[in-house]
Regions:
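Short, polar loop/linker segments at the starts of domains and inter-domain junctions
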Residues: 44-51, 149-158
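Loop/helix patches that line or flank the sugar-binding groove of alpha-linked glycan CAZymes
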Residues: 1-115, 120-127
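A short acidic, often aromatic-flanked loop/helix-cap motif at beta-alpha or helix-coil junctions
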Residues: 41-42, 147-150, 163
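C-terminal beta-strand-rich structural cap/linker in extracellular carbohydrate-active enzymes
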Residues: 151-171
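A residue-level detector for conformationally permissive "hinge/kink" positions
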Residues: 4, 8, 92, 137, ...
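Beta-strand-rich binding/interaction modules
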Residues: 124-146
Length: 171
């Protein structure tokens, strides 16, 4: 969702719904009824065999009420796409930080530049001096994910499983 273009979300993905095609030549197990959480009782498609007991991530209703849920995370990412038009419309250039676990993009759009960085490590924080990179952005606009980020002078620290958006000013 933090890339250019028009993202596609398959329904249920935003709440972590599970399903599998298996060996059957049908999509019935991937087109299960949406788990809204209200009193409605939608039925799964005919011929579906995926056990409802494996749907362990909750419903739309329960995830909307839960801070930090997958659905709230998706809502935040969509909000960021709307707040920063450069994300869906900009020109992307890869940023090489010399790390297999941290990287990202410079995004240019209508004279402004954002930098979107991701630390995909599960346990190792990432630190870089932005003065040693081609990243012109020096202000943290957004922190997304599991941890924190900080910018002390030009030294950026990014926690594991965390992304951020850098810019020169708020949109």
């Amino acid at each position: 969702l933090l890339c250019s273009g028009s993202p596609f979300l398959y329904y249920g993905e935003e709440i972590g719904m599970k399903g599998v095609r298996g060996s059957a030549n049908t999509d019935a197990n991937r087109r299960l009824a949406m788990l809204w959480g209200d009193d409605s009782s939608p039925r799964d498609p005919e011929d579906s065999t995926y056990p409802s007991s494996k749907q362990t991530n909750g419903t739309v209703e329960s995830q909307l009420a839960q801070e930090g849920s997958l659905l709230r995370y998706y809502c935040r990412l969509i909000s960021l796409r709307n707040r920063y038009p450069a994300i869906p419309r900009g020109t992307y250039t890869q940023v090489n930080l010399g790390s297999a676990k941290c990287g990202g993009f410079l995004v240019e759009y209508e004279g402004s530049t954002l930098c979107i960085l991701h630390n995909i490590s599960t346990d190792i924080p990432f630190t870089v001096d932005l003065a040693d990179t081609d990243i012109p952005c020096r202000s943290i606009l957004e922190v997304i994910g599991m941890g924190e980020a900080s910018l002390e002078g030009t030294v950026l620290s990014l926690a594991p499983q965390t992304s951020l958006i850098l810019g020169s000013a708020a949109p």
